[in-house]
């Protein structure tokens, strides 16, 4: 049976909410694993999982979207793609020279307990996200995404106000291949069970 690889967002992990709901709704196995916050390490991890799992579809949430864009040849569904997060991280990276900032950021963004990505906001790690975005956009320029990508954005996504999540940025690269739901950055269960499940089944059916 064809598998789905789910790439979680910042602080997510193997027990993230959306993939667990998806698995209740569809018969295809949904594979989700916890990757490192360091994007260089994570890129290697995710590439190896793609080779192992051989997914028919990638679903990428929030910060995981940049990792998905570095992959080629697979259809991708995006949930609240945070394509501009590296710009925000660039600013945060300089603040970490203040001794209080790294422990403060670690506390503010501390993930829930469980099998979750461990977050440690150091200058070294945050600065790597600039190169990470460059590599993702390089792949975008060299790849034809016709009928291969689709994104969902929430009307009340607080990261859209900061520009971290941006419909304008999405349209620049992928046109009108998106839909907006009346919800937040973290897609609510009712939308996972309706619009996301419907899109997953549609993409799988179109890519047999």
Q: Where are these predicted regions, by residue range?
A:
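The alpha/beta-hydrolase serine catalytic core
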Residues: 75-77, 81-207
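Short hydrophobic segments within beta-strands
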Residues: 6-10, 59, 152-154
């Amino acid at each position: 049976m064809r598998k789905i690889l789910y790439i979680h967002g910042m602080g997510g992990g193997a027990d993230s909410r959306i993939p667990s709901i998806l698995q209740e709704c569809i018969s295809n196995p949904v594979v989700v694993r916890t990757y490192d916050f360091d994007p260089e390490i994570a890129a290697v991890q995710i590439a190896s999982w793609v080779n192992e799992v051989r997914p028919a579809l990638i679903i990428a949430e929030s910060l995981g979207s940049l990792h998905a864009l570095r992959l080629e040849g697979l259809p991708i569904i995006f949930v609240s793609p945070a394509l501009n997060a590296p710009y925000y991280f660039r600013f945060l990276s300089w603040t970490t020279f203040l001794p209080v900032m790294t422990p403060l950021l670690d506390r503010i963004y501390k993930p829930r307990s469980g099998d979750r990505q461990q977050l440690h906001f150091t200058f070294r790690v945050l600065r790597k996200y600039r190169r990470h975005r460059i590599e993702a956009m390089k792949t975008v320029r060299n790849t034809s995404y016709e009928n291969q990508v689709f994104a969902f954005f929430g009307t009340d996504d607080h990261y859209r106000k900061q520009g971290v999540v941006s419909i304008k940025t999405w349209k620049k690269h992928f046109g009108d291949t998106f839909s907006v739901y009346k919800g937040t950055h973290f897609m609510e269960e009712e939308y996972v069970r309706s619009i996301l499940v419907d899109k997953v089944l549609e993409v799988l059916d179109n890519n047999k």
